[in-house]
């Protein structure tokens, strides 16, 4: 008896994790990627596995960010333009920025965060994934009283859901992170977290898929997904691939493919940036551990001998145009906390599109009206963090290995 065939559309962290766990369930899996494996939004993320960190819809942070939303030097920026779909999305997003919704989201994301940490540990140990994985946690460092207040709230919220987190004074942070300026007022430490090189992680997982007999095909642009009892995908080349099931793990590009199946996923592309710095041969990045800069939401992550500055959230459409001012803001933000970070050589400047939902939760499950087409998208800034648990959940949904849990039901596309 032949194995069931599953097509996974998208070769980022979500797609390869879905393929990996499907391959563990005796499935013939093929990953179809439009570009190269791991070269989309996964490539340039901050590399922080921030399990349990509160989602986008934190009311206090959102209210603060929306006051300067048209200022291109702030963490959240909306490019002025006529875009009815974005306006509708923002309306729904603001309606979800309540304490009640935040608590509901954490009730879903908390268990997923604990599960994904276990899966990461298993992957690193059992598959010997070489991705500069460091289970050293990360810091939130703040220079203002408002920032430290936000950090204390993050700690309280994460502790309430079983994650190890502690509030730190400025002096305590300075003792642990000696490269920071001495005007840091306080912050937090989240030990139930880790860091890695996200691109290497994706490439390594894709290699394990191939070792298990799966295929990864690059340069394969999927233009249409056909549903029904015998699903299939059509490529830009005119080719047609049939399968027993299809998984859409196409990030910010999921909207169009799902729409043709009658499903309107309210996903907006949130552009993020990174700038990688190297500090000369034999030198190490000027940080002992990863940290997020509380007032600017910029992550500073030591990664494979370099320092990655990553962050910002920009709504400017489905494009990869980079704005120099956004890149410059990354360095300017880091210098507020680290001082002069030169002499450093810029080795990479990048932007990518994160798929953002208005309620702050990913979209995982069967598309409405379909029995064999599944979505795995909408992770915003948590794609790397939730990659393994998403892959495991999707594999169970596709194969029917276990009944859907409460968390999976909350992520279903039908909620929209």
What are these regions (language model features)?
Residues 46-168:
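Dinucleotide-binding Rossmann-like beta1-alpha1 core, especially the glycine-rich loop
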Residues 24-43:
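Glycine-rich FAD pyrophosphate-binding loop
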Residues 4, 167, 361-416:
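C-terminal lid/capping helical subdomain adjacent to the catalytic/cofactor pocket in oxidative enzymes
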Residues 46, 193, 297, 315-318, ...:
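Glycine-rich phosphate/pyrophosphate-binding beta-alpha loops
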Residues 149-161, 180-237, 241-244:
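Helical element adjacent to the flavin cofactor pocket in flavoenzyme catalytic cores
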Residues 2-12:
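Beta1/beta-strand and adjacent pyrophosphate-binding region of the FAD-binding site
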Residues 104-117, 140-150, 175-176, 188-207, ...:
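Short beta-strand to alpha-helix junction loop
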Residues 47-49, 53, 57-96, 222-231, ...:
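Active-site substrate-recognition segment that forms the wall
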């Amino acid at each position: 008896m032949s194995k069931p065939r599953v097509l996974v559309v998208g070769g980022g962290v979500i797609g390869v994790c879905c393929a990996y766990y499907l391959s563990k369930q005796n499935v013939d899996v093929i990953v179809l990627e439009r570009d190269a494996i791991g070269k989309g939004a996964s490539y340039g993320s901050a590399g922080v596995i921030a399990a349990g960190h509160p989602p986008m819809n934190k009311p206090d942070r959102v209210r603060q960010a929306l006051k300067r939303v048209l200022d291109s030097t702030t963490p959240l920026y909306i490019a002025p333009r006529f875009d009815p779909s974005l306006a509708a999305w923002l309306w729904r997003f603001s309606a979800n920025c309540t304490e009640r919704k935040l608590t509901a989201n954490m009730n879903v994301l908390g268990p997923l965060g604990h599960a994904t940490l276990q899966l990461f540990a298993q992957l690193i140990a059992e598959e010997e994934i070489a991705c500069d994985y460091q289970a050293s946690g990360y810091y939130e460092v703040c220079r203002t009283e408002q920032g430290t207040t936000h950090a204390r709230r993050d700690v309280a919220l994460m502790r309430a859901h079983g994650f190890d987190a502690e509030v730190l004074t400025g002096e305590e942070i300075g003792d642990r992170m000696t490269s920071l300026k001495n005007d840091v007022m306080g912050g937090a430490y989240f030990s139930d977290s880790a860091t890695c090189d996200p691109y290497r992680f994706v490439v390594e997982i894709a290699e394990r898929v191939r070792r298990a007999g799966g295929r990864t095909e690059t340069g394969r642009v999927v233009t249409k997904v056909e549903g029904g009892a015998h699903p299939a995908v059509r490529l830009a080349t005119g080719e047609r691939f049939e399968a027993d099931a299809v998984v859409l793990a196409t990030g910010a590009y999921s909207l169009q493919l799902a729409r043709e199946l009658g499903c309107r996923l309210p996903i907006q592309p949130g552009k993020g940036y990174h700038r990688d710095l190297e500090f000369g041969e034999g030198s190490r990045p000027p940080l002992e551990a990863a940290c997020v800069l509380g007032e600017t939401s910029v992550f500073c992550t030591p990664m494979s001998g370099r320092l990655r500055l990553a962050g910002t959230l920009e709504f400017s459409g489905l494009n990869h145009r980079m704005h120099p001012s956004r890149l410059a803001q990354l360095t300017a933000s880091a210098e507020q906390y680290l001082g002069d970070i030169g002499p450093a050589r810029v080795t990479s400047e990048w932007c990518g599109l994160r798929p953002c939902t208005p309620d702050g939760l990913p979209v995982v499950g069967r598309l409405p009206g379909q029995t064999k087409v599944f979505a795995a998208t909408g992770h915003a800034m948590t794609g790397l963090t939730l990659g393994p648990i998403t892959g495991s959940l999707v594999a169970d949904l596709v194969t029917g290995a276990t009944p859907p849990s409460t968390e999976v039901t909350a992520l279903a596309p039908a909620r929209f």
